[in-house]
Amino acid sequence: SAKEMNALQPGTRSFAQFDMDSFANVTNDNDNPYLADMTKKAIELLNSNENGFFLMVEAAHIDKFSHKNILEGSTAQVIEFNKAIQVAYDFASRDGDTLVLVTADHETGGITYNEETGEYYYTTKSHTGVNVPVYVSASDAGFITGEAYDNYCISTQLARVMGYDKSQFPKTK
C-alpha cells in the first residue's frame, strides 16, 4: 500500500507488489501509489547509498493499452509516466551527478494521425518495427543527437558512463 511504502526508511530492503490492474486507473481510487510516488520513494531510499544507484522505472500499461488499441488509456499512462520522469529529472537537476535516460523497448499499435479527419488511430495490435526515441539528460553521456542505436548498445553506454569497462561484462554467444 502507499502507507506501507511511505513508511520505508533508507537502508530498508523492500520487494513491493501492487495490484497492477489498479495502475490502469489513473484516478487511483485505491491505496496503491502512483508511479511518480514510487519513483520518488525509490530515489529517496536508494540515494542513501554512497556508491550511487541505478533505478529502472517501467510504465508497462502504456504497452498494455496500446495492444488493446485504447488511445485514452495509453495516453493517460504516458502522462503518468511523464510525471515519474519529471520526479527523476528534478532529482537529477538538484543532484548534479545523476543521468536520466528515457526510452522504450518497442512501439506498439502503430498509432497514426489522419490529417483529413484530424483523428488518431491504431494500425495494429502488435509491436511495430518503428524506432523508439532515446532521451538523455546529460550531454556527456556519449549518445549522439539524431543517431540511431541498437537497444543492446544502450546498456553498454550506460555501463561506461557509470565507470564499468566493457571487458567486465559477461560474454554472450
Q: PLM features: what roles do these ranges have?
A:
Residues 1-173:
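A post-motif C-terminal structural segment
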